[in-house]
Amino acid sequence: MPVKVVSPYGSWASPITADIIVAGGLSFSEIRVDGDDVYWLEGRPAEAGRSVVVRRSMDGQERDQIPAGFNVRTGVHEYGGGVYAVGSGTIYFANWEDQRIYQVEENASPQVLTGLPEIARGDRYADLTIKDRKSTRLNSSHALTS
C-alpha cells in the first residue's frame, strides 16, 4: 500500500490530467429507426468533436453514413436537437461548417438542399423530421438590420 503524504491544498500532483478529462469517449445521441436499420449520432472527440450519423444494419454491421469533411451539428441548439432525420434510407442533416441542409443516400456523396444565406452561417436549421417523404425543419435566420 502506498504511503500517504499530506500536502497543502493545491500543491500535490494529481493523477487526473486535463488530457484525461478531454480525451473522453464517444458520445451517442439522437437514435432513429428506419425499417430494419438503427441510426445514431456519434460524437467523436478524437476527430475534433465531429459528429457523424452511423447506421447499424440488420446483419450487425456498423457504417458511417456521413463522409469526412462533414460535421452533423447545428447552430440553433449548438450541441444537439433534431440535427438529422432519416427515412427510406435517405438522411437529411445540418452541416456545422456552413449550416446548410444536405441529403445523403447509401454509398453516395451528400447533396446540398439549401441555398447560401446572405450572411455566412446566417440560416440555421434544427428539428429535422420527415413527413410524407419530405424533410421539414425549423429555420432560424440571423440577419443584420439597419
Regions found by a protein language model. Give the residues of each.
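Residue position within the beta-strands of beta-propeller blades
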Residues: 38-42, 92-94, 135-137
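Short loop/turn segments that connect beta-strands within the blades of beta-propeller domains
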Residues: 34, 49, 87-88, 96-97, ...
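Structural motif
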Residues: 46-54, 98-103
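Multi-bladed beta-propeller domains
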Residues: 2-27, 57-80, 104-124
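Single conserved hydrophobic/aromatic residue that forms the stacking wall/gate
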Residues: 134, 138-146
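Hydrophobic alpha-helical hairpins/lids featuring a short glycine-rich hinge
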Residues: 91-96, 116-128
